[in-house]
């Protein structure tokens, strides 16, 4: 990467990126392998990221953000994702899936209560959409929120919720009118310490070992009506809009994963000697490196296009967000695989980071919408069946 050729970035963007890169190299890189092996969630590092103001790029200063915008958010997310897939999730849990949703749809009271606390990491956030039997088909969710005086009574179960075992609050989607299907969905802010909320960690997963993920069981949980986001019954529309934001973050994190794989592979190719010279001299190794670099840069270009559009006010750019998400997340699966070809046997050992990068890269094709769903949105838009940008 050459700084002067990054023509899309302002000097401010470059300074921010350099600052975050230095932070990640100094604070995250030395502990990442140990934290992953020990499945240790680093709350202290989340606090440090908050102290540096990293969560606040798309949030106005008035609510504790810095208003630097979406491209700044993508740059920060990539740099943290490059160092740790587990810590990358913070940019959806503190910002896009929580603070930004509350900023868009919350009452003034709710905004003041939650957004600054998320920005400073005084509160840890999560968002609950997926259920055991309602995943890609979000409108099939069965968690209910039934109005009872000044409160909603919530019953149901959420599955695969990032940070739920450590979270203080949750942006929760539930059915206020089950019969109305997607028109009966609403969004709430739920206090995770409320009576009736139980979060159970899913401990044995393929990757992201330092990132607690869990189920949320809700039994007669009472949420004040003031914690309803926007209007009752409009939750499905809000969910789609929230996903347009969270998918940008996932795509930016995926680029970080790709870049980490590129870095490790280049280093190794130059250091590893076989047949009397570095393997970097062999054309077949160069071919692999070329593909890794090109895939990473292509993914980054799509992420930046999407973020720049949002910075120009085109925040509902579903089409471009989904294209970036599809491409970058596919690359986060493929580029570390290519890295394993370069590192070969040593890459198969946990002595080198490529094994962790490969494991963590797998998740991007699943979360914030599986790859098939991205392809479906791209194709139905292209075929004129359903316009993605509305
Ligand atoms: C580590 C991790 C963290 C997560 N964090 C969160 C979180 O914080 N909050 C949250 O709400 N959710 C979270 N999720 C859930 C995630 O968003 C879902 O896993 C995702 O939406 C897809 O659901 P599924 O994996 O159950 O797949 P399913 O929906 O069961 O689909 C299975 C397969 O069928 C395909 N498929 C489904 N429908 C179609 C169709 N119509 N056409 C073609 N193919 C189709 C899918 O592409 C997929 O390949 C997380 C998941 C993981 C693994």
Which residues make up each language-model segment?
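Short glycine/proline-enriched turns and hinge-like loops at secondary-structure junctions
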Residues: 68, 137-139, 163-168, 181-184, ...
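Flexible, glycine-rich active-site loops centered on histidine and acidic residues
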Residues: 99-105, 127, 139, 179
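A short, Trp-centered hydrophobic/proline-enriched beta-strand micro-motif
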Residues: 121-129
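Flexible, small-/acidic-enriched active-site or ligand-binding loops
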Residues: 140, 193-224
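Alpha-helical interface subdomain recognition
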Residues: 1-93, 105-110, 117-122, 135-138, ...
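Conserved hydrophobic/aromatic beta-strand scaffold that supports enzyme active sites
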Residues: 126, 140-144, 151, 169-173, ...
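A short core secondary-structure module
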Residues: 150-151, 155-199
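Short Gly/Pro-enriched turn/cap motifs at secondary-structure boundaries
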Residues: 91, 118, 133-136, 160-163, ...
């Amino acid at each position: 990467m050459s700084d002067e050729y990054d023509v899309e970035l302002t000097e401010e963007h470059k300074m921010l990126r350099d600052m975050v890169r230095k932070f990640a190299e100094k604070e995250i890189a030395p502990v990442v392998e140990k934290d992953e092996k020990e499945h240790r969630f680093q709350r202290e590092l989340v606090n440090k990221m908050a102290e540096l103001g990293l969560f606040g790029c798309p949030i106005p200063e008035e609510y504790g953000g810095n208003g630097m915008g979406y491209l700044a958010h993508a740059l920060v997310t990539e740099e943290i994702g490059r160092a740790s897939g587990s810590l990358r999730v913070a940019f959806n849990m503190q910002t896009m899936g929580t603070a930004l949703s509350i900023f868009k749809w919350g009452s003034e009271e709710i905004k003041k209560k939650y957004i600054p606390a998320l920005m400073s990491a005084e509160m840890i956030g999560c968002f609950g959409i997926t259920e055991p039997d309602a995943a890609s088909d979000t409108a099939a969710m069965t968690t209910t929120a039934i109005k009872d005086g000044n409160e909603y009574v919530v019953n149901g179960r959420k599955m695969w919720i990032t940070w739920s075992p450590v979270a203080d609050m949750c942006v929760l989607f539930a059915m206020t009118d089950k019969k109305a299907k997607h028109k009966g969905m609403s969004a709430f802010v739920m206090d995770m310490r409320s009576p009736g909320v139980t979060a159970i960690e899913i401990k044995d997963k393929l990757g992201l070992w330092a990132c607690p993920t869990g189920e949320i069981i809700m039994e007669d949980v009472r949420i004040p009506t003031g914690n309803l986001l926007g209007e009752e019954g409009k939750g499905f529309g809000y969910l789609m809009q929230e996903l347009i934001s969270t998918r940008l973050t996932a795509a930016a994190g995926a680029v970080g994963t790709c870049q980490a794989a590129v870095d490790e592979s280049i280093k190794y190719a130059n250091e590893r000697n076989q047949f009397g010279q570095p393997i970097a001299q062999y054309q077949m190794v160069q071919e692999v490196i070329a593909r890794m670099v090109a895939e990473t840069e292509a993914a980054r270009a799509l992420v930046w296009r999407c973020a720049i559009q949002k910075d120009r006010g085109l925040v509902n750019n579903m089409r471009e967000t989904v294209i970036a998400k599809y491409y970058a997340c596919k690359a986060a699966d493929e580029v570390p695989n290519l890295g394993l070809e370069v590192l070969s046997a040593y890459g198969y050992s946990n002595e080198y980071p490529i094994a962790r990068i490969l494991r963590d890269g797998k998740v991007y094709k699943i979360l914030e919408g599986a790859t098939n769903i991205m392809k479906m949105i791209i194709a139905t838009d292209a075929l004129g069946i359903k316009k993605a940008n509305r």
